[in-house]
Amino acid sequence: LNNKYIVLDLSGMPDDMIADGTFWATSIAYDLIMNCEDELSALLADELWSLVGATANPQAAGFVLEMVKTIRGLGGIAVTSTQGMQDLFSLEGGSYGKGILDSSRIKLVMQMEEQEARLIQDKLNLSEDEVRQITRFRRGEGLLCIGYNHVPIAFHTTPKEYEAITTSPTDLRIKRTGQIDE
C-alpha cells in the first residue's frame, strides 16, 4: 500500500456489518498512518459516529478517540464528519464525541436543526446569533470555528468541481441517466 491516497469504501457493506467494517477500516487506516513516520498523514472518516454513537461498543469508541488524539499529536490531520451531532453524543454521556471535538482544533459547522445546534452550543461556545445563523445556512454555507474565533464562510464551486463532488440525488440521477425530470 504505497499509494498517496488509499480509500476504504464501505458503501456496499450490509447494514449489520457496518460497525465491524468501519472499525476494521479505521484500524487499517490508523496502522498505515502510524507507519508513515516521515510524511504528514490525513485520515478522512465519513460517518465515524457509528463507532462512537449510542449503539457503539465503548472499546471501539475509545479506540477512535485515542486514534484522533494520536494522529493530531503526530502533526497529522483527522477529519471526521456526521450529518447528526446527536449521534456523536449518545454513548456514555457524550464523552467520546466531546473528546473528538476537543481534539479537533478546527471545526466546520454546516446547516443543522436548532436542537442539534443547541447540543453543540456550549461545546463550541456559540452565541445565540451563531446558533440562529447555523439553523438558517443554505447549501455551501458554514461556520468555521477555530478556538473562540467563529467566522461564517461560503464555499463556491466551479461547475466541474460541483459535478465531481455533488451528493444531490437529483443531480446524480441526471448525471447517471442524462435526463432531466419534467
Q: For the regions a protein language model found, what residue spans apply to each?
A:
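Conserved P-loop NTPase motor cores
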Residues: 11-133, 159
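Conserved P-loop NTPase motor module
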Residues: 1-9, 16, 20-21, 27-35, ...
